[in-house]
Regions:
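C-terminal non-catalytic regions of proteins with extracellular/luminal or membrane-system context
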Residues: 1, 7-302, 325
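C-terminal outer-membrane/trafficking sorting elements
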Residues: 285-366
Length: 366
């Protein structure tokens, strides 16, 4: 009698139901594809929990990617996406659920509402079984694809809540002073909540008007995580090089920047851009040349920083080394190799003069 009395008493003082469900290695693993739906028993579990209680429910989902949640998400009061957190995952999740840690994670992907909404849906299945798939989405994957289609998503790229709130204000864009940076973007982030926490400020760039190629509405170009105490404010600064405005031109075998207007937006996710400024790039820049770029002129084509790249046909009278933004990084004379000391990670194009002929090559510092 006392046991049952205690049990029912305990049941009625529960503040929150924590429902843990999702996938494991039996339903989601390398070497196979799972369905977008939850495993049937897992969906049955969360459905029963929802039907049996009016107590607030917090869902904890273990999965390596998005799942169909239209049938149950509206009944949850909170959702913690655990991914696969490892052997200490229980400790980490407990600290988040009980408020010892203020979460600040952001989604690295977009969570669609339906699998058919995904930009890669039409190229995922080999419907005619000819072992040939057309990747028709091109660069319009993830949030770029949803911007293009206008589909409403479940949770956008870069989304994530915490136990506090933040505000962005006072955005400015001004010329930058530096070797590579051309613009400096500054905004002010304030913790407007009651607990300390971190926020990830995200910066997106979008070309306005026409371009030689079809381009996304916006693209993530920079982000910073900032930790603030309650009521604290901090200036958040981004430096943008020409890379932030460039695209690869196949005809020119180089990254180029179109002249014209661009929107620079900052916010907390791909769908929560709170501040925006328009800038104008007045002239095209970058390595624009009608000379064919042949990587075989330089060997090896991929090197560690500090190693040398050999010029395959011997000594050249002159070699100019540029990064992909068109910034000159080195002038070399009467040389048969390109030293990479002082070069950062990335691709470089070399303009060489051989017997009064101009030849280009390229290499990568990894």
């Amino acid at each position: 009698f006392f046991f049952f009395f205690f049990f029912f008493f305990f049941f009625f003082v529960v503040d929150v139901v924590i429902a843990c469900f999702g996938h494991d290695s039996g339903s989601e693993a390398e070497g196979g594809d799972r369905t977008f739906a939850l495993p049937s028993k897992q969906k049955e579990l969360i459905t029963k929990v929802i039907s049996k209680t009016t107590t607030p429910i917090v869902g904890v989902v273990t999965a390596g990617g998005n799942v169909e949640m239209q049938s149950w998400i509206r009944h949850l009061d909170g959702l913690l996406w655990a991914w696969y957190p490892g052997q200490e995952g229980g400790t980490a999740l407990g600290e988040i659920l009980f408020g010892d840690i203020n979460p600040s994670g952001k989604l690295p992907v977009t969570f669609e509402k339906r699998w058919a909404d995904n930009p890669t849906y039409n190229s995922y299945y080999d419907s005619d079984n000819d072992k040939h798939v057309e990747f028709t989405e091109g660069i319009f994957m993830g949030y770029r694809g949803y911007d293009k289609s206008g589909k409403t998503v479940q949770y956008p790229f870069g989304y994530g809540l915490s136990y506090t709130t933040f505000n962005l204000s006072q955005m400015t864009v001004e010329p930058a002073i530096g070797a590579d940076a051309i613009l400096k973007v500054i905004c002010e982030l304030k913790n407007t909540g009651d607990v300390a926490g971190a926020q990830v400020v995200q910066l997106y760039v979008g070309k306005k008007g026409e371009s030689k190629v079809e381009r996304p509405l916006k693209e993530l170009k920079a982000f910073k995580k900032v930790y603030l105490k309650p009521g604290e404010s901090q200036k958040v600064e981004f430096s943008l090089s020409e890379d932030a405005f460039s695209y690869y031109d196949v005809d020119q075998a180089s990254f180029v920047v179109d002249e014209g207007s661009y929107d620079i937006s900052v916010g907390f996710s791909a769908d929560e851009l709170l501040l925006k400024e328009e800038v104008v790039i007045k002239k095209p820049t970058g390595l624009q040349s009608d000379i064919f770029v042949d990587k075989t002129y330089l060997l090896p084509t991929v090197v560690e920083a500090g190693e040398s790249v050999n010029i395959s046909f011997g000594i050249v009278a002159k070699a100019d080394v540029y990064n992909t933004s068109g910034v000159l990084k080195a002038n070399l004379y009467n040389t048969d190799r390109i030293p990479t000391t002082g070069l950062t990670q990335g691709m470089y194009v070399v303009h060489m003069c051989v017997n009064d002929k101009k030849i280009n090559g390229k290499f990568i510092v990894k």
